C-alpha cells in the first residue's frame, strides 16, 4: 500500500476533468491523479518540479490500482472520509476538493447548504443530503470549533446591526463572493462598526456594503478568487 511519495516530475497531463502527474521516485514512475489547483501551479511553473511530496490514497480495484495525491495529509484524510460515504466514489471526492477548500465544505455542512454541494458535478439533491448528514457526524468537533469561533468573533448586542450583518452576508453571496472570503472580512467589518457608529449617527447598510466590498476587492487584487 502506497501512502506517501517524494520524487521529481516527469510529465503532467489532463484527461477531461482529471489531472495527472507522473512522478519519478527512485527510478519508478508513479501515475497519480491530483487536484486541479496543484496541477495549474505545476503547469505555470509556480512551484518546483523537483522533490515533490504527495500524500497518497491508494485504491485497489480488480483491473487497476489508482493513486490520488494531495499536498497535505489533511486533504488526504478528508478525501478518505468522503469516500466512506455510501455511493460516493473517488471522482466525486476529487470534485469536491477541486471546487472547495476543506473549511468551505465544513461551513456548507454546518449551514446545510445543499445548493453549494450540488454545484459539484455528479452530485444531485439526494446525494447532497446524504453528504451533509453523514459528514456532519464525522466532523462534529470541527463544526463546533467553527461555531464557537464565529460566536466569539461576531457577537453583537445590537439586533439592528445583527440584521445588517446578516443582510450583508446574503448580499455578498448574491454578488458571487465565496463564503470563505466573506467570513474572512466580517470580523474586520464588525470591529469598524463601533468606530463608524461613533463618527456618524446614520450608520447604514449601504456604508457597510461599500466597506465590505472595498476589503474584498483589496483581497482579490492579491489573491485571485
UniProtKB/Swiss-Prot annotation:
Major localization class: cytoplasm
Region (Domain II): 72-150
Subcellular location: Cytoplasm
GO MF annotation: an example: four-way junction helicase activity
Keywords linked to the UniProt accession: Cytoplasm, DNA damage, DNA recombination, DNA repair, DNA-binding
Family membership noted in the UniProt record: Belongs to the RuvA family.
HAMAP family membership: DNA_HJ_migration_RuvA
Protein name listed in UniProt: Holliday junction branch migration complex subunit RuvA
